[in-house]
Amino acid sequence: MSLTLSELQIRTLKQTLESSKIPFKSEVRLDILSSFKIGGICPVVVEPENSNQVLETLFIFYKSEIPWKILGGGSNLLISDHPDNFVTLRLSGKFKEFEYLEGGKFRIGSATNTTPTFRQISQLGYTGAEFLSTIPGWTGGAVIQNAGCYGGELFDLIQTVEFLRNNEIFVRSPSEIKHGYRFTEFLNEKDSIILGIEILLKEGNLEEIQTSLKDKRDRRNSSQPENKKSAGSVFKNPKIFLENGKEIKAWELIDQAGLRGQIKGGAQISPEHCNFIVNVGAATAADVNYLVELILDKVFQTTGIRLNREIEYFGDIP
């Protein structure tokens, strides 16, 4: 277990941030920043508003030897019950904006909320991104995981990704970035920070776009736990196909293992969609992790298939 940050480290960090005029908050409950509504108190959350402030913040972290993690929309994340051995970086300001460029191109900041952002873009009469209006979280997180559903993936639309790596800002096309099903190279690079993207869409018929938005929203609501505290799909589909071409889904394997509705503390494997774990009470990260490990073990024992987590862990989780 990592040691907590010292009071001197925290006090010095706050003084440095104040003198640099970089926004931050103290003693932040991370559960309120998570769709799971799980997570403890972080000593400092730093909220840089532009690229220069991000670079300066990282310089401060490295100079002071302060461990840090970046947090986005918190929608596909399980946050530690005790996030007190690091500080959190959370982009703000210009990173929360998107703008139309020309010819169907949009520049989208990494801290934009995917659901309203891509709904607004679609309602401007541009088609191709309707599926993203059903995915919660922030655009930066969607980039990192190559988020997708209903046959579409974010990288199908991306023209360029702007990101920070090793204190340098890069702009790369999808062909220059390793990516695949719910995967990009950024997943394994904890020090890389997505700053924004440019996407290209086609003009479409607004009435058809509105219908598409509604159909996808209704489809999502009918197949997933509604108004429940969760982090979305817990496991990736294993990409295994039957002889008839039907894809085996993670939820089917979990159901086959007899785990639908299983409860640990305040967490439950959803009776409605068993690839979801929901917070039905005062669930802890430890409760959720117990169910995650249970699913991994039981599915392997039952089917011989090893599932891979889709949700990310944020901090130490026993």
UniProtKB/Swiss-Prot annotation:
Gene Ontology cellular-component annotations: cytosol
Enzyme Commission no: 1.3.1.98
Listed Basic and acidic residues bias regions: 213-229
Cross-referenced InterPro entries: FAD-bd_PCMH (IPR016166), FAD-bd_PCMH-like_sf (IPR036318), FAD-bd_PCMH_sub1 (IPR016167), FAD-bd_PCMH_sub2 (IPR016169), MurB (IPR003170), MurB_C (IPR011601), MurB_C_sf (IPR036635), Oxid_FAD_bind_N (IPR006094)
Active site: R182, S233 (proton donor), E310
Keyword NADP: yes
Pathway named in the protein's UniProt entry: Cell wall biogenesis; peptidoglycan biosynthesis
Taxonomic superkingdom: Bacteria
The keyword NADP is annotated on this UniProt entry: yes
Cross-referenced PROSITE patterns: FAD_PCMH
GO molecular function: FAD binding; UDP-N-acetylmuramate dehydrogenase activity
UniProt-annotated stretches for the region Disordered: 212-232
A biological process term (GO) from this entry: cell wall organization
A Pfam entry, by short name: MurB_C
PANTHER family associated with the record: UDP-N-ACETYLENOLPYRUVOYLGLUCOSAMINE REDUCTASE
Name of the protein described by the UniProt record: UDP-N-acetylenolpyruvoylglucosamine reductase
